[in-house]
Swiss-Prot record:
Oligomer status and interactors: Core subunit of respiratory chain NADH dehydrogenase (Complex I) which is composed of 45 different subunits. Interacts with TMEM186. Interacts with TMEM242.
Name the record gives this protein: NADH-ubiquinone oxidoreductase chain 3
GO molecular function annotations of the record: NADH dehydrogenase (ubiquinone) activity
Spans through the membrane: 3-23, 55-75, 84-104
Pfam families assigned: Oxidored_q4
Gene Ontology annotations of biological process type: mitochondrial electron transport, NADH to ubiquinone
Function of the protein: Core subunit of the mitochondrial membrane respiratory chain NADH dehydrogenase (Complex I) which catalyzes electron transfer from NADH through the respiratory chain, using ubiquinone as an electron acceptor. Essential for the catalytic activity of complex I.
Localisation: Mitochondrion inner membrane
InterPro entries: NADH_UbQ/plastoQ_OxRdtase_su3 (IPR000440), NDAH_ubi_oxred_su3_sf (IPR038430)
Membrane topology category: Multi-pass membrane protein
Organism in which the protein naturally occurs: Pan paniscus
EC number: 7.1.1.2
Length: 115
């Protein structure tokens, strides 16, 4: 009963905060407010410069490899399982996929900054 009460309270509080943020938007946007601020001087360069596609691809690759490493973190606790061969095979499969994807990125020159 306490769990349901806590869950309902948190849900209602989250919904209330979401409704308040939609009802009270910042509508007074003007040119001076949307310009970048550099210590009171006029900006030296535009603030909305697009970043390179190479950086974006490296960032996405990092996120994917980080996710795969996070999947490997519970392996020490998984060694205590009753079905050890299945756990070893699945971990070897995951490590193989990680190594093959790294080799593919390397061969496609996805990790090289110089062109």
């Amino acid at each position: 009963m306490n769990f349901v009460l806590i869950l309902m309270t948190n849900t209602l509080l989250a919904l209330l905060l979401m409704i308040i943020t939609f009802w009270l938007p910042q509508l007074n946007s003007y040119m001076e407010k949307s310009n970048p601020y550099e210590c009171g001087f006029d900006p030296m360069s535009p603030a909305r410069v697009p970043f390179s596609m190479k950086f974006f691809l490296v960032a996405i690759t990092f996120l994917l490899f980080d996710l795969e490493i996070a999947l490997l973190l519970p392996l020490p606790w998984a060694l205590q399982t009753a079905n050890l061969p299945l756990m070893v095979m699945s971990s070897l499969l995951l490590i193989t996929i990680l190594a093959l994807s790294l080799a593919y990125e390397w061969l496609q020159k996805g990790l090289d900054w110089a062109e």
